[in-house]
Design a protein with these regions (language model features):
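Glycine-rich, aromatic-lined ligand/substrate-binding cores of catalytic
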Residues: 812-845
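C-terminal extracellular loops and terminal segments
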Residues: 69-73, 697-704, 745-763, 810-821, ...
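Short, small/polar-rich motifs associated with maturation and membrane association
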Residues: 1-304, 308-312, 316-318, 322-324, ...
Length: 974
């Protein structure tokens, strides 16, 4: 789509090539012909009174994210995209204008070609998408009513063009990926042994042992279970390496687990065209992508067919259909479980080998000459005895002996008919059907690893989801001289069904991983979720002289998620705008070519209620679990008591904004201020113990988000030899609880308190290392005789510091501001697109680093190189407590592990060369483009060792790292 605009309007960001372009430089030309996809239709950009951002296919094509919504990162103002972890195919978290709930869903509604999409968004190929439109305020989203409080993303797929000959395009890419950032630096084998000895010696000193150095030497190997040296006691009583001691191995777990050359290939093909009445678009794609952890991958195949035809002068019909399937292997890449790949790197030091060793340190082979994985308990005849951690586990062995394969398929068909009933009256009916399958199968090896004791384990989940969405709309548009009105009425019925089945068994023979071959069926379970939604919608628009615009929308939604008494919800949106530059007093202004003021106000809803980490479809009803064995009889357990008064979460949204074009529209932009107040928040309320259950869902509180959005675009140079355009966007918002059913309560590292953000850290305050004892210290309140706080003082008692009154607020996990910077250059046949995204002001609690700074409190656990700076003698001034092998609170949760999380990332870079069309004509080719594409090319970050894109809660979880991907591609058009 080669969009050319005369002005920028309504906070809508349109890209030509990679930036906003002006069609004419004349300030007097101000009418805009381009239309924008909005709720249940399209509108001229000039007529939109709400806050909308559009990203087109060329911007999408310049990013390599498997999930098409990842292309919004850094390009869509007001949209915060967070991609956590390096598993390819994972969908990013999307936050539009803050976070409007504490327990319900905070993710936007996805609309695909006019209907809600419930499948996996990464099953949609970016090559099939024409544009994505983000609706951010009540004025633009109110027609989606109960599902729109978190914003709406409308994805529009490509179509053919009328009277266009067949146009075929093929794109192929081959690439390689590696971790985008460096991990925390950990100790090598020699240093680990040295400082382990030091920690044991310090413990012996504390115990009053007569010769602590010799005691540490005698204890070292027994405490670790393994000896990587060629001598029995490699460290002497003074902490030095004995003469002749050499390491037999020094395992680099990072190299063994992480994929430093992850292969990528992608192939896309489409053909489109049309005659005088019918258009078509046919596309197919294949993507094969390896992840940052070895054996992780994502493979996808898809096909799409879009057809439209004007079968009668008064009748137009169309159908959009697609099928996609994907497969992923998902080794555990987060969390602190024994099977987590990243946790393993940060837990197992280099002294523990990947493969078993004999008494001389040589590798032990099996009967086929293969190395044997070391599972931490080698037994007799081997050099080593037993690890003090993760016995019967080996992360590398798990990568290749176990698997967790997820297969998804998605089928959509969306048909419509448009009938012109009269000159200004039309009717549209649309029926969409979506079916998606989820199939996960996990296998833990029968012979080695955690499931060896039960003969292996197989877990399988199979789920089938179906969605039917039926809409009918009546549209009336009429002009009376300078007056223009539009009326729209819509009736929508939505039905969703999700059928889930899970089973697990143990005891498998070699080569068998089918559930019905298990010896012991461990568990079986299943459920069916259903939802129905009936909606009545209306929209009215009016403008006078295409200068003054008014819009009102209303929807009434009825959802089966709520009781009959609270089932109906009414939602609305109001918007107004004024194009000031069309007034006579600005008509000939040489500086201001376009100026528009706009505002909107309305109320939206949120019916995506979360219970126990999953969406709840029966939140108001009494829930039971049946099938529990009670003394051999079928039993029933109360899961949750009913609350028939439970109702919608509601969000009241208001926005004021200005759009402008300056200096013959060489500089264009928009500025928005928004406020979003969410009330009737749904959260778990405790029940009396006599009820026999802990919580039930209730409407208990309110929260608000407010902030600014700034978007600027400039056409720096535009001539035949050189083009350069720039786009910059910045967003900032604050988050605050305004109502709660209790004064406050702790939620992990946060405290929910009225007047504070739900993202404010509330933890003990680190005071440093006691120079005399080498142990940690913290600040607590200093109180007078009357109990009044008069200041802060230092204590070495962590229990006191961890009391609620002594903790402090210490930064927020949401950034002060975030956004992106895009520059597009074109010199002759060469073009370059560079996109940076950035985030400043947020804090992250690095629990991974916290575990690496335990100071050898537990034997055998890996440590950061920073423990080499630990306190050793009275009077030492350092910020690292002493290394001591005894339980202590030195690395307990506190501000010691809270860090600024600022970053700037070169998100995408595309350098292309287009061969001259005159050279291609002889070959029947009309396009030949060679390009190099990079994703996550470079990262600057204030806190090293983690990927800066962590969850919005600001806590690390030993997640895998995003990949830096470099690809070589070619596009050929016929």
């Amino acid at each position: 789509m080669n969009v050319k605009l005369r002005v920028l309007t309504v906070g809508v960001l349109f890209f030509t090539g990679q930036a906003v372009m002006a069609q004419k430089d004349s300030a007097k030309v101000q009418d805009i012909e381009e239309v924008v996809v909005v709720a249940f239709g399209k509108q001229k950009k000039e007529a939109i009174t709400g806050s909308v951002t559009t990203v087109d296919e060329k911007v999408i094509a310049n990013q390599q994210a498997p999930s098409v919504t990842g292309a919004l990162q850094g390009t869509a103002v007001g949209v915060n995209i967070i991609t956590t972890g390096g598993q390819p195919g994972n969908n990013p978290s999307i936050y539009i204008r803050g976070v409007g709930s504490i327990n319900s869903s905070t993710q936007p509604l996805i609309i695909l070609d006019g209907s809600p999409f419930n499948g996996n968004i990464n099953n949609i190929s970016q090559d099939q998408v024409e544009s994505m439109t983000v609706l951010k305020d009540a004025g633009s989203t109110a027609l989606y009513g109960s599902r729109a409080s978190n914003g709406v993303i409308i994805i529009t797929t490509k179509k053919g063009k009328l009277n266009a000959r067949p146009q075929a395009t093929m794109t192929s890419l081959i690439g390689v990926g590696m971790p985008a950032v460096e991990l925390h630096e950990t100790l090598g084998g020699a240093d680990f042994m040295k400082y382990s000895w030091q920690s044991i010696k310090n413990a012996k000193v504390a115990e009053g042992v007569a010769n602590p150095g010799q005691a540490a030497t005698n204890t070292l190997i027994n405490s670790l279970g393994y000896n990587p040296y060629n001598v029995a006691n490699p460290i002497d009583a003074n902490g030095n390496l004995v003469a002749g001691a050499n390491l037999l191995w020094d395992t680099n777990w990072e190299d063994a687990i992480l994929n430093k050359a992850a292969f990528k290939q992608e192939h896309r093909f489409n053909v489109s065209g049309g005659d005088a009445k019918t258009t078509y678009f046919l596309a197919a794609d294949y993507l094969d992508l390896s992840g940052s952890v070895k054996s992780s991958n994502f493979e996808r195949t898809g096909i799409r067919l879009n057809l439209e035809s004007k079968v009668k002068d008064y009748l137009k019909v169309g159908m959009n259909s697609s099928f996609s399937s994907s497969s992923s292997n998902l080794p555990i890449q987060s969390g602190n479980t024994y099977g987590s790949s990243i946790q393993w790197i940060y837990s197992l030091p280099n002294i523990y080998p990947i493969f078993r060793r004999d008494a001389n340190g040589a590798l032990i082979k099996d009967g086929f000459g293969n190395n044997i994985y070391d599972y931490g308990a080698n037994g007799a005849g081997t050099l080593n005895s037993q690890r003090p951690l993760f016995e019967n586990e080996n992360a590398v062995g798990a990568l290749y002996n176990n698997y967790d394969i997820v297969k998804r398929s998605n089928f959509t068909v969306n048909g419509f008919a448009e009938i012109d009933l009269a000159k200004d009256l039309s009717f549209r009916t649309q029926l969409a059907y979506e079916q998606f399958m989820f199939d996960e199968k996990a296998y833990d090896n029968y012979a080695v690893g955690a499931a060896a004791s039960v003969g292996g384990r197989v877990s399988q989940i199979r789920a089938l989801g179906k969605t039917i969405n039926f809409t009918n709309s009546l549209n009336y548009d009429k002009s009376f001289g300078d007056h223009n009105i539009g009326l729209q009425g819509v009736f929508e019925v939505y039905q969703y069904t999700y059928d889930y089945l899970q089973a697990q068994g143990t005891g498998f023979l070699p080569g068998n991983d089918v559930l019905n071959t298990s010896t012991v069926p461990e568990s079986i379970g299943g459920y069916v979720n259903r939802e129905r939604l009936v909606r009545y919608l209306g929209r009215a628009t009016y403008n006078y002289k295409n200068k003054y615009f008014l819009e009102g929308t209303f929807s009434q939604d009825s959802s089966t998620k709520f009781s009959p008494d609270t089932r109906k919800g009414e939602f609305y949106g109001l918007g107004a705008s004024w194009i000031v530059s069309r007034e006579n007093f600005l008509a000939d202004n040489s500086v201001i070519n376009y100026l528009k003021f706009r505002g909107s106000y309305g109320e939206l809803g949120n019916n995506k209620i979360i219970r126990d980490g999953a969406e709840s479809y029966f939140p108001y009803q009494t829930l039971f679990s049946a099938g529990n064995n009670q003394l051999g009889q079928t039993g029933v357990i109360l899961d949750a008591p009913a609350n028939y008064d439970l109702t919608w979460e509601a969000s009241i949204s208001s926005t004021v904004g200005v759009d402008f074009g300056l200096f013959k529209n060489r500089i264009t932009g928009n500025v928005d201020y928004f406020k979003r107040e969410s009330k009737d928040l749904i959260y778990s309320r405790p029940t009396p113990g006599s009820v026999g259950n802990t919580t039930y869902l209730d409407n208990i509180g309110a929260i608000e988000n407010y902030g600014w959005e700034i978007n600027l675009s400039s056409k720096n140079f535009n001539n035949a030899n050189f083009q350069w355009t720039t786009n910059f966007n910045l967003s900032t918002y604050e988050n605050k609880l305004t109502e709660l059913n209790q004064a406050s309560f702790q939620n992990g590292t946060k405290r929910y308190e009225v007047g504070r953000s739900i993202f404010d850290f509330y933890i003990p305050e680190w005071a440093g290392v006691d120079a005399q004892t080498g142990m940690g210290s913290w600040f607590i309140n200093d109180v007078d005789a009357n109990g009044a706080v008069i200041g802060r003082k230092v204590t070495t008692n962590y229990t006191l510091a961890n009391q609620a009154d002594n903790k402090v607020y210490a930064g927020s996990s949401i950034p002060d501001f975030f956004g992106g910077l895009t520059n597009y250059f074109k010199v002759g046949p060469v073009d370059l697109n560079v996109l940076f995204n950035y985030s400043f002001g947020s804090y992250v609690f690095d629990s991974t680093y916290q575990s690496l700074m335990a100071g050898f409190a537990r034997p055998g656990y890996q440590q950061s190189v920073d423990v080499m700076n630990a306190w050793q003698n009275p009077g030492d001034v350092t910020d690292v407590p002493m290394n001591i092998q005894t339980q202590n609170n030195n690395n307990a949760t506190s501000t010691r592990f809270l860090f600024k999380n600022d970053y700037v990332r070169l998100k995408s870079l595309t350098l292309g060369y287009n061969i001259n069309k005159d050279m291609l004509d002889a070959f029947g080719v009309n396009q030949f483009r060679i390009f190099v594409q990079g994703d996550n090319v470079w990262t600057w970050q204030s806190h090293k060792g983690i990927d800066p894109e962590q969850s919005i809660s600001g806590t690390t979880d030993s997640r895998s790292y995003q990949s830096r991907t470099l690809s070589l591609g070619v596009t050929v058009g016929f």
